[in-house]
Regions:
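Alpha-helical transmembrane segments and their immediate juxtamembrane cytosolic regions
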Residues: 1-194
C-alpha cells in the first residue's frame, strides 16, 4: 500500500468540510429561502466557492504526478460525474449539474494523461507562471454566452445552457496544471536536496 501524504489529506479534509458548509448555506438560501445576505448579496459566496474548487483542482493536478494510471483516474472521475449528472437531472430540485467540478477533474486528468510527456519537457517554473497567467486571462470566457452549440464543456456555453455547478475545461485546466507543475518543481527540489 502506498504511503499517504498527510498534508494533502488534511487540506482535502478541511476543504470537504468547507464544501459541506457551502452547500448547506446555498441550500438554505436558495432552496429554502432563508435570508442570508452575507452569503447571497456579497462577493463572499464567490470567494468561498473558489477557495473550495481551486484547492480541489490544484491538489488533483499535483496527484497526477503520483498516479500510476491517470487514464484510469480520469475514467473514475468521469463515471462519478455521470452519476452526479443523472442524479441531478432526475431529482430536479435545482438545475442539473452539467460539466461540474468532478467532470472538470476528469477532463483535466485526461488532458494530463494524454500530454504528460510534453508537459514534463516544460520547466516547472515556466509552467506554473504560464498557467497562472492563462487562468487569469481566460477567467471570463465561460461567463459569456456564445452562438456555438455543444461547446459548453470547453468553456463556451451556448444560449439556453444551464448548470447548477459549472467548471468547464477553460479556464480551470490551468489551475489543475498549476498543481501539476508545482508538484514537478517540488519533486525536483526534493530530488536535488542532499
Amino acid at each position: 500500500m502506498q504511503k499517504r501524504i498527510t498534508i494533502f489529506d488534511t487540506v482535502r479534509g478541511f476543504t470537504m468540510l468547507s464544501m459541506a458548509g457551502f452547500h448547506a448555506c446555498y441550500d438554505l438560501a436558495y432552496l429554502y429561502g432563508w435570508n442570508m445576505p452575507w452569503f447571497t448579496g456579497t462577493i463572499f459566496q464567490d470567494i468561498w466557492r473558489a477557495s473550495i474548487s481551486w484547492v480541489f483542482l490544484f491538489i488533483a493536478g499535483w496527484m497526477c504526478t503520483l498516479s500510476r494510471n491517470n487514464v484510469k483516474r480520469a475514467a473514475k472521475y468521469a463515471a462519478a460525474a455521470l452519476i452526479v449528472w443523472i442524479a441531478t437531472t432526475l431529482v430536479s430540485v435545482d438545475d442539473s449539474v452539467n460539466f461540474g467540478i468532478i467532470y472538470c477533474m476528469a477532463a483535466c486528468t485526461a488532458v494530463v494523461a494524454l500530454t504528460r510527456s510534453l508537459l514534463q519537457k516544460i520547466p516547472s517554473s515556466w509552467g506554473i507562471a504560464t498557467c497562472l497567467v492563462l487562468f487569469a486571462l481566460t477567467w471570463g470566457i465561460p461567463k459569456a454566452v456564445y452562438p456555438l452549440p455543444y461547446l459548453a464543456w470547453l468553456g463556451f456555453p451556448g444560449p439556453g445552457f444551464v448548470s447548477g455547478d459549472y467548471y468547464p475545461l477553460i479556464p480551470f485546466v490551468f489551475m489543475y496544471l498549476t498543481g501539476f507543475f508545482t508538484a514537478c518543481a517540488a519533486q525536483i527540489a526534493n530530488f536535488e536536496t542532499p
